[in-house]
Each structure stands twice: as structure tokens, then as C-alpha cells.
Amino acid sequence: NSSSEILKNWNYQKEKRIWGEFYNLFEEKYLKVKELIVFPNQGMSFQRHFHRNEIWFVSEGSCKVNYSKSTEEEKKEITLTKFDTFLVKKNEWHQIINPHQTECKIIEIQYGDKVDESDIERLYYFNEGK
């Protein structure tokens, strides 16, 4: 580990998930900033939030995003690469997938009436092969 990684681990709370991990970098009542690290060949659930918007900034690597403003049947796949940004508004379905052999790092800015992990509806998980 580099000294910057050791400092980050000491300063910020890390949470592990099946798709990777994230650090909570900053938090206020209506705002939260995270660093998401999506591991190679992993992905998140196809999900939406009712009380918050999210802005994603890809800081390292690239990923695919399944995205729909309304229904799962209308989803589109887009690719995000380093320094790309993407806006997900509340109630819009979204899923990050990393099909590559290297990590994808994303700075996620959440803002809205509620910025906690309970504000989520999942349609399906990454490993369900949809």
C-alpha cells in the first residue's frame, strides 16, 4: 500500500460490497460524496432511488451503465471512460458494470431529500444475468 492509500483508509470509512467497495468522503444532511471502486468483472444491481440524484465522475478505468428514465424494457447501455460524467435523476433506473480486467473508480455525488443506503429499489442483481 502506498502512503496515500494508508491515509485514505485511516481518514475515510470503507464499506465492502459484493461488487467492490466504497469510501464515504464527505457527508452533510442533503449531500454525500463517495469514491466507488467497482472490481473487475463485477456490477451493481439495476436500481433506482426515490429521494436523491447522483452525479458520477469516472476518475480511473471505464465501465458500462445500463440506464432507463422509466422502465427496464427501455434501458440503454452506455460506456463511460476516464473523466466522463453522468447524471442520474431520482426515479431513474441505473446499473454500473465493470466488464474489464482493471478496477473502475467513480466519484459519486449524491444530493436530495435523503442520502442514505435505505433509499433504494432493486429490480435485479448483476449476477442474475439480465
Q: Model features per residue range: what roles?
A:
Residues 1-18:
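Classical nucleotidyltransferase
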Residues 15-53, 109:
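A short glycine-rich, His/Asp/Glu-containing loop-to-beta-strand
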Residues 33-37, 55, 77, 85-87:
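Conserved hydrophobic/aromatic beta-strand scaffold that supports enzyme active sites
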Residues 45-47, 65-67, 87-88, 94-101, ...:
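Short beta-strand His + acidic residue motifs that chelate non-heme Fe in jelly-roll/DSBH
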Residues 48-50, 57-58, 80, 98-101:
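Short glycine/proline-enriched turns and hinge-like loops at secondary-structure junctions
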Residues 51-71:
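Glycine- and acidic-residue-biased ligand/ion/polar-headgroup-sensing regions
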Residues 69-93:
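Short acidic-glycine-tyrosine-enriched beta hairpin
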Residues 95-130:
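Double-stranded beta-helix
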